[in-house]
Structure formats: structure tokens, C-alpha cells
Amino acid sequence: MVQPVKDTKFDEYLEFPCPFTFKIMGLANVNLTDQILAKLQVIAPGDYAPKVKPSSKGNYESVSLVATVTSGAHIEEIYNVISNLDDVRHML
């Protein structure tokens, strides 16, 4: 499980609302992207075009997507909810 994100300084460095890129690394399975998008639609509804790249051995994949965020707390919430998915290993 990924460590919870809290007490960040996003509010000091970004003007909201703004697009924010998230990169999620997890175990390669057919449901990872769907699980991520399902959670993200609840927190930040929108149309997403995730970019998925498999690892060289095919055991992992990275999912990159851009979401419109409204505050630093919104970014933290997205990090915390998605990082709690069972197959997620790292999130940037």
C-alpha cells in the first residue's frame, strides 16, 4: 500500500482549477485502468484518455492521465483514494 498523502503545499504553487497529471504504477491486469477510472470518476468526473505502458517483462504497467483538480485537498484525495487500490504499487 502506498503511504497517504497529506499536508502538501500544492495550494502555494498552483492556481486552481488546473490540469494535473497523475502517473500510477501497478500490477498488470485487465482491470487496473478500469479500477482507476471508476474511482477517479467519483472524485473528479470527466472524460479521460489514459496512456498505458507495460513494463519490459509485462508484470507491471503505468497509467498516466490528466485530471482537472480544484484544490490541493482535491489532489490529496485523488492520491489517497487511487493509491488504496489493491493492484496499485506507486503513484506520482
Swiss-Prot record:
Highest rank taxon of the organism: Bacteria
Matches recorded under Gene3D superfamilies: 3.30.70.260
Pfam families in the cross-refs: DUF493
Gene Ontology CC annotations of this record: cytosol
InterPro entries: UPF0250_YbeD-like (IPR007454), YbeD-like_sf (IPR027471)
Stretches assigned to coiled coil: none
Stored SUPFAM superfamilies: YbeD/HP0495-like (SSF117991)
Family membership: Belongs to the UPF0250 family.
HAMAP family: UPF0250
Name this polypeptide is given: UPF0250 protein PSHAa1021
